[in-house]
Amino acid sequence: MFETNYWPFPDQAPNPFTAQIEQLTATENVYIFLTTLFGILQLVYVMFKLLCTMFPSLHFSPIWRGLENFWLFLSLASLAIAYWWLPSMTFTGYWALTIIATILVFILLIMMFVKFVNFVKLFYRTGSFAIAIRGPIVLVALDVTIKLHCTPFAILVKEIGNIFYLSEYCNKPLTAAQIAALRICVNGQWFAYTRSSTTSAARVAAANSTAKYHLFVLQGVAEYTQLSSVKFE
């Protein structure tokens, strides 16, 4: 008989619902714990997205920035652990991870649905498909660019960009007063960062050029996507 991992007869297949937790190895327990924690953070991330849609000022909260960075770290850690430890999984471990993966996929579908609703809302308000599809594409490119510059200022610019994206939309660009308010806000945060005692001169010089670049890109996004009604509190 050929060796196989399949059970052709249902009465001979192991029942995962009656499996004992003690059968899991320490490696499996660690992986399942981290994956479950990652799924919980994904759910909290979706809830924060929904709250920030209703209250854009939440994007300035340090809790939000810390949660997003921690969520990104666990994403990479989960992938690394999966590639390293997955071959040693038993049947019970695979069954548990299948349920967790299903939950994660469901959460990602919710996030995609929220983005689709925002797109439909923007299309309904502007009446232009080009404007509606332009905003998400430009902000995704901005997000990828900022991920390559892991500085506090870059994170700040990303949060301000999200405020533009989640704010009210209309068919006119940002006013000069709104651009001035944005510049004051960004420069104020940047001044506090560059005066930090733990910041080296080399990092300040390198990040200074990055700051000017991101400020230019952010203003271009605001004008290019024709966003308005941004509230600065």
UniProtKB/Swiss-Prot annotation:
Superkingdom assignment: Viruses
Main location: virion
Pfam family, one: DUF2632
Intravirion-side segments: 53-69, 115-233
Residue ranges crossing the lipid bilayer per the database entry: 32-52, 70-90, 94-114
A molecular function (GO) term: structural constituent of virion
Topology of the protein relative to the lipid bilayer: Multi-pass membrane protein
Subcellular location: Virion membrane; Host Golgi apparatus membrane
Side Virion surface, residues: 1-31, 91-93
Gene Ontology CC terms, in alphabetical order: host cell Golgi membrane; membrane; viral envelope; virion membrane
Record keywords, A-Z: Host Golgi apparatus, Host membrane, Membrane, Transmembrane, Transmembrane helix, Viral envelope protein, Viral matrix protein, Virion
Role noted for this protein: Component of the viral envelope that plays a central role in virus morphogenesis and assembly via its interactions with other viral proteins.
Subunit (UniProt): Homomultimer. Interacts with envelope E protein in the budding compartment of the host cell, which is located between endoplasmic reticulum and the Golgi complex. Forms a complex with HE and S proteins. Interacts with nucleocapsid N protein. This interaction probably participates in RNA packaging into the virus.
Full protein name: Membrane protein
Organism, scientific name: Berne virus (BEV)
Gene: M
